[in-house]
């Protein structure tokens, strides 16, 4: 599956090729900051299948939390495009896909301990208070 996407202003473009390893939603507070309050819808892809085709992403890694990840975003408009955890995968933000319908639906929800009353977890998918190991 070849997917293309980019940021809001168009300065950053990417392509990712392969099958998603996971399609999920995250309700953690860190993701709520990034999304403006909503759960974060994402796909985990093999890290070597993601590449930028236009522009250079700015990176940010928090140093004051356990298990930090590197977040990549457009230096012009600030759109959060993807996250790089230490384990060598690319966590692609669904809203940045040219065709978000290609995502389908999440197969699980994580960090529901931080879920807000206005967040929706689809019926029938596994939900975890933290990240499953």
What do the PLM-derived regions correspond to, one by one?
Residues 1-6, 11-133:
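A short Gly-Trp-Pro
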